[in-house]
């Protein structure tokens, strides 16, 4: 066999190996950077109103991993036992380091879109809707998590801050 034939054969083998390696990498599932938040988190929250004293209440936040893509469904339920209730659901999809999705406040019947970024310990997103806009930052490590919501317009409240535990 000629040297040219060996060179072409070797190139074909290398190209084939590269194609197989690329296909194997493409088939590898993408790691979900928010998976460490999955589970049920319980704790206390403080709402700072636009005027008047702060109010404290209990919160339960659950995160369910999505089956169709990297990301989570966040269910946020806060209640002071008397006047304040918040039942919100957020669908979060991760694309690279971006977070997109939709949110819904089930008590006030409002909803909107989600856009933000993955952070080293969670995510920071903007909640945009017709009647409500805010930023939300979630950070969780080990057994501890913090959730902070800052509305763009502080007609009702200026800040909602929760400290949660999973363990």
Regions found by a protein language model. Name each.
Residues 1-11:
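Bacterial N-terminal signal peptides that target proteins for export
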Residues 13-14, 24:
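Cleavable N-terminal signal peptides
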Residues 27-139, 148-167:
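Central antiparallel beta-sheet cores of small beta-barrel/beta-sandwich binding domains
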